Amino acid sequence: MRGEGRGERGEGKDLRQGDPSSLVPRPSPLFHRLGLQDYEPVWRQMKEFTAARNAVTPDELWQVEHPPVYTLGVAAKAEHLPRVNNGIPVVKTDRGGQITYHGPGQIVIYTLLDLRRRNLGVRTLVRRLERAVIELLQGYRIDANGREDAPGVYVAGAKIAALGLRVRNGCCYHGLSLNVDMDLTPFSAINPCGFPGLEVTQLRDLGVQDPIEAIAEKLLDRLAAGI
């Protein structure tokens, strides 16, 4: 059941603490399963983690689901705001990109990486994140691709995964989201990533029936191998 194992929502605490099984040891990076968490406390903790890290701080991947929320990137404009008042909060963030939507049934993975230590440029990292999603979809016999003019992953022209990063002192945070089994209706109130008329899709609509937790584990493995 999707609700099992979700973290307790709250502020003013380290969201990575709790059940020790939520920390899955890997050679690099470490992986934390945060469960269902409000967007802003997780964003705040990403910034705090990045500001406090040093040359030997392990890289981490955080997997999370968010309650319904629109997030605006630094390139967002007034015309990108939701066209209807559907009660979903809008949060202005410091990530790259424009507007997107997060909600239950979507895998969000935040990539907290030391790019200098990994000798990675931002463009290379974006391509590797896209490649991890594309390879995951290939495992389900779904043809997908990236786009030079619009970071993310697309299936037959419809967006299935979004990317957005922030780099501070050679280290990045934010990451990617993959639509799995969610209500896509809130996307219709925006121009996803600033593109009018851009369609979105998800794995359930493409015939994938695996539980979201299993899909997340597969994606994590791809990401850990690719970065």
Model region roles, listed by residue range:
Residues R2, R16-P20, R26-I160, Q209:
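N-terminal lobe of the biotin/lipoate ligase/transferase fold
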Residues E4-E11:
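Intrinsically disordered, low-complexity repeat regions of secreted/extracellular protein precursors
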Residues V74-P82, I160-V180:
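Short, conserved beta-strand/beta-arch hydrophobic-aromatic motifs that form part
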Residues H102, C172-V200:
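Short, acidic (Asp/Glu-rich) active-site segment that either coordinates a divalent metal cofactor
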Residues Q106-T111, P196-R204:
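Acyl/amide activation-and-transfer machinery of modular secondary-metabolite enzymes
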Residues I109-T111, P151, L163-L165, L176-V180, ...:
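A structural signal for short, well-ordered beta-strand segments
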Residues L120-V122, H174, F187, P211-I215:
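Short, conserved charged micro-motifs
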Residues A132-R141, L203-I227:
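Well-ordered alpha/beta subsegment
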